[in-house]
Amino acid sequence: MSSPVNSDSSPVNPSQRALILVVERNPAVQRLERFFLEQAGYSVEFASDGVSALERARELCPKIVVTEILVPRLDGLSLCRALKSDPRTRSIVVLVFSHLHAEDRALEAGADAFIVKPIDEENLIDIVSKLLEIRKEGAGG
């Protein structure tokens, strides 16, 4: 079983945790997402809108950006296009989610994956883990 969840016998050093930038404006949802993703062994940072997410992505170089399509100031699809067109951020994996069935539009914008909401904790962690594994394999291991 290749779960990203840590066992007591193999703790993850915080400096070795993959950094995930989540675009989420609701503080209650941020707390839940932080809890679930940190329990799974990831470091988590948040941006409350697309413009600040783009700035934070350039500053932090996270492994993954997780964004909804409908976010303020710069929608998730425009954020994805901006990330994928910038040499500093084009290698960042982008996971887009929405209530809208917009997978084609998300993939055309450069998203690496798309999820229809609602997203449950296990599904989110599983997809993040798989995307990181694919990215690692693509980078030569």
What would you call each of these model-derived segments?
Residues 27-45:
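Two-component/phosphorelay signaling modules centered on CheY-like receiver
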Residues 49-52, 75-78:
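Acidic catalytic/metal-coordinating carboxylates
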